[in-house]
């Protein structure tokens, strides 16, 4: 009976940890998109001779790099 309780507590802590990581990544993606929209609205992502924005791909690359780092950290601690 004690082993079942320990397993249930461990599973609950794991699910809560994954939920916290998911919420952090979701919040991070929202912040990066908002910053990208702000940069695009002010025109800071365009050079003098460029017609295409660069903030959105850069924000996506940043979000992907942070997601990989968080995933590696979570994998190394478990």
UniProtKB/Swiss-Prot annotation:
Domain of life: Bacteria
Subcellular location: Cell membrane
GO biological process terms on file: sodium ion export across plasma membrane
Annotated TM spans: 12-32, 51-71
Keyword Signal assigned: no
Protein topology in the membrane: Multi-pass membrane protein
InterPro entries: Na_pump_deCOase (IPR005899)
Alphabetical UniProt keywords: Cell membrane, Membrane, Transmembrane, Transmembrane helix
Main location as per UniProt: membrane
A GO cellular component entry from the record: plasma membrane
GO molecular function annotations of the record: sodium ion transmembrane transporter activity
A Pfam cross-reference name: OAD_gamma
UniProt protein name: Uncharacterized protein TP_0055
Organism of provenance: Treponema pallidum (strain Nichols)
